[in-house]
Structures are given as C-alpha cells and as structure tokens.
Amino acid sequence: MAWLAADADFNPDQLGLNVIGIASEIARHDSGEHAHKMGQLLFTNSGSIRITLSGQLCILPPAHIAWIPPDTTHRAEMSQVTGYRSVYINTVQYPILPKEVKVLQVSSLLKEILERIAFADFDTDWSKRPFLDLLNVGLNEIETASSVSVILQFPTDRRLRKFLGTELLPHLNVFADLVGLSEKTIGRIFLRETGLNYQQWRQQWRFLKAIELLSKNEKISVISHHLGFSCESAFIAFFKRMSGKSPRMLIKKDQS
C-alpha cells in the first residue's frame, strides 16, 4: 500500500505487480490526462470524482466505484474528496474484469474488500490464500454489481463541440439559433453520435452536474437555480426520476 500525498506522482506500471492498492485523503487533485497498462478501480467515501475520457464525461458519486480498463486515456479531477482509494489490477492475470469503462454500485462487502486491498502491503502475494480468496470474492462482487448511468457521451461534430462545456445548454430552439443549424439537424447529430436525443442528453448532463454539486455540499436551492429548475421541488422530482433516490439520500450517503 502507498499512502499518497495529493501532489504525488504514481505509476503502477513501474512496480511489475499484479495487484496494487493505494490510499489517500485528497481534498483537491487533478491527475492530468494519462493512461496505464493496468486496469484501475477507484472510489471515494465522500465527494465526487470527475473523470474525463475520450469523448466522454463521467461523474463518480460517493460510495460507487469506477472501473477504467488498461490503456484507457483518462483524467481524474477531485474536489472535497476524502477516503480516496485506488486498486490497480493486471487484467492479463485477471481477465474477468470488464472491457469497457463502468461505474458500479458498491455493496458493503465489496467496499470492505477494496479497503483491505488498498491498505495491503505491496509485497502481498495475491496468488496464495488467504489473499487469493479475498481477491476472488472481490472480483465476483464486481462481476455481479449493478452498473449506474453516470457516463455521458459527447457528440464529435465540430459545429457542436465548441458549445459543450461546463454550463447547461439552452433549450433546443435557442441552441439551434446559437449554432446556426436546424433543430432537426441537431437532433439527428445528437442521436447518431451519443445515442440520446438533445433533450435526453441535456437532462443527463443536468443529472451529472447535480451529483457533482451535491457532493460539494451545495444547497439544494442553489443547485436547482444553477441548473435552471423553477423551484426546489421540481429539481427533487427530476433527481428522483433520474436516480430513484432523493438528493438528500445522496448527501446522507456521502456523509455517512
């Protein structure tokens, strides 16, 4: 295990191990764009992690795990994060892990296993019992865990990309005037390149931004105004519809 400072550089590929765990209490950190030969599981007890991938945005909520396959270029930005843990795994040795980026719900059992791996010594022999048993249970838990829709695909059309950033896009008719394309053309581009129509994409962006702001302990009144809702109750209803949970449940989970 390596207990890392927020500004520390760490390259798991240099160690030549099959399983590596690290832990940190990171308040704020930006990994920069990078990739590694090992797959990576990352999670946090509180706060969210913004993960930027090639053409995709992922917001990792607290008490969830993100799986990033080997050789996947990504950038992880953390704000107000505590209890950061990362587990690197050689997928040649353990091919059961997913081939694509996933965000998964974490059972109490899986969380405890990942915690133990994150704090294990680097020289732990994961090919021998009892460590092998622990690792196998963890891998089985990952295989059966439910995935969460917190990854947003961005359109690649250059006419649209320059308008897609950190702020909520306007309604379709306003955006069409801004871009200089018809509403139908924009709708076709979004559906073809993201799998979502414009309104669905806009709502998913809102949802991810809401998770990020909730994880920073922003007030619901502030979030609902920032995301263009008419009132708090409208935002709460939206969040429940998107996640099946109320915003306060996420906050409670974050602080537990």
PLM segments and residue spans:
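Short beta-strand segments in beta-sandwich/barrel cores
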Residues: 31, 46-52, 65-66, 74
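Short hydrophobic/aromatic patch on the recognition helix
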Residues: 63, 186, 190, 234-235, ...
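Aromatic/histidine-rich interaction motifs
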Residues: 99-111, 115-116
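Terminal helix-turn-helix DNA-binding modules in bacterial transcription factors
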Residues: 173, 192-232, 236, 252-256
